[in-house]
Curated annotation (Swiss-Prot):
It comes from the Eukaryota. This is Aquaporin PIP1-3/PIP1-4. The gene is PIP1-3. It is found in: Cell membrane. Residues 1-42 are annotated as: Disordered.
């Protein structure tokens, strides 16, 4: 026991990661069959002990760094496309979509075992509604994600200030020809697809039944981001991540970037909530199981 306490003191995980993207978080019950499978217990709303755990702060740092890298690569890609005078000389919308999807794939893979690999306040919100993490951790994650996004966009502006300010800074706005309602709807549906994919790819019951599911989880999540970007870049530039939208808007800081900004918070949070309800209530029927 003394050795175990020493590990905790030195920074080893005292509190188990509840984020479902983390492979260790949902490993319990791997030997159970479908009939005997037991749902993981819901995370407490508030867990004061987390604030004394190094793993809590380590997870927040991982979210900060991941979101920083995400904004850095993706906004640089957007600037590269904007700089080109010919569609044939650039990667185009497909390349932008690949940069977003590819970075999510890589970063979820890298951070899944540390923080759960959220990299998105909408994902964190959806998982919180499903009681996969505490309110304390959810708020901390969202703050760190937003700070990372601001820093990532800021570094891009520092590298290419003229190009950055002259080409919209990667900020999300509703494109001409579309209404705010169109933009809101695109963000709701796009985020629903992403968060539903997160729930499905990291489902605890599937993880218990099929050992390969946790390892492959980053792939469908990244691919969902790629496909949503292909569909909605012409409408809103594709938000589906409030931290990504906030970071670009703060660093770009022009009126038209702020006039539509509410869409990129309200839409993703509604989409995440709908995905959480759909998966937990309809697909998994967890509220009904708890009564039986």
């Amino acid at each position: 026991m003394e050795g175990k306490e020493e590990d905790v003191r030195l920074g080893a995980n005292k509190f188990s990661e509840r984020q479902p993207i983390g492979t260790a978080a949902q490993g319990a019950g791997a030997g159970d069959d479908d009939k005997d499978y037991k749902e993981p217990p819901p995370a407490p709303l508030f867990e004061p002990g987390e604030l004394k755990s190094w793993s809590f702060y380590r997870a927040g740092i991982a979210e900060f760094v991941a979101t920083f890298l995400f904004l850095y690569i993706t906004v640089l890609t957007v600037m590269g496309v904007s700089k080109s005078t010919s569609k044939c000389a650039t990667v185009g919308i497909q390349g932008i979509a690949w940069s977003f999807g590819g970075m999510i794939f890589a970063l979820v893979y890298c951070t899944a075992g540390i923080s759960g690999g959220h990299i998105n306040p909408a994902v964190t919100f959806g998982l919180f509604l499903a009681r996969k993490l505490s309110l304390t951790r959810a708020i901390f994650y969202i703050i760190m994600q937003c700070l990372g996004a601001i820093c990532g966009a800021g570094v891009v502006k520092g590298f290419q200030q003229g190009l950055y300010m002259g080409n919209g800074g990667g900020a999300n706005v509703v494109a001409p020809g579309y209404t705010k309602g169109d933009g809101l709807g695109a963000e709701i549906v796009g985020t629903f697809i992403l968060v539903y994919t997160v729930f499905s790819a990291t489902d605890a019951k599937r993880n218990a039944r099929d050992s390969h599911v946790p390892i492959l989880a980053p792939l469908p999540i990244g691919f969902a981001v790629f496909l949503v970007h292909l569909a909605t870049i012409p409408i809103t530039g594709t938000g589906i991540n409030p931290a990504r939208s906030l970071g670009a808007a703060i660093i770009y800081n022009r009126d038209h970037a702020w006039s539509d900004h509410w869409i990129f918070w309200v839409g993703p949070f509604i989409g995440a909530a709908l995905a959480a309800i759909y998966h937990q209530v309809i697909i998994r029927a967890i509220p009904f199981k708890s009564r039986s």
